[in-house]
Amino acid sequence: DRLRSRGLGDVYKRQEKETGTVLDEMQKKAITEAADHGLFILTGGPGTGKTTTINAIIRFFEGEGAEIRLAAPTGRAAKRMTETTGYEAQTIHRLLELNGMPEEERDGHSAKFERNAQNPLEADVIIIDEMSMVDIHLMHSLLLAVVAGTRLILVGDENQLPSVGPVSYTHLRAHETGAYL
């Protein structure tokens, strides 16, 4: 796989050198899993190392020349993601290019996302943080806009704020996939 060509060992060393943070075995396993699989779920409580792990994942894919997109369900979460990664993040709605035309111009149609199956997102890797706040409808729209071959990394804490709409991703059983910090 072209994204694994440089090896993960370099990422671990670079992480230590640039941040002074030594990755533990669970974090290394998470990075390997994210590099190996098209869909990866990273979940864990506060202080478990999710941010450090995500930063190392970003470093790995950056080193491979991958186009990376970061997003979160709210502006506040996206801003925090930008601050902690140093990489620009945006809301999922903005990532999917919500067409917010005024109601009188919609001709009976609701607002829609410009990015979808016919006009997919262009990225090698998409990382979504605060997944516990994403409802099933937004998740469906996101999945429609992701093409085969794009790695989708979902990050969250199932014990944090629930989604505002119906059902959230936390019903996925991340602990059964081995994708748990």
Please annotate each region the language model reported:
Residues Q90:
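Short beta-to-alpha loop/turn elements within the nucleotide-binding domains of ABC transporters
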Residues F60, E64-A66, A72-R80, T84, ...:
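Conserved helicase motor core of SF1/SF2 NTP-dependent helicases
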Residues S5-R6, D10-G45:
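Pre-Walker A segment
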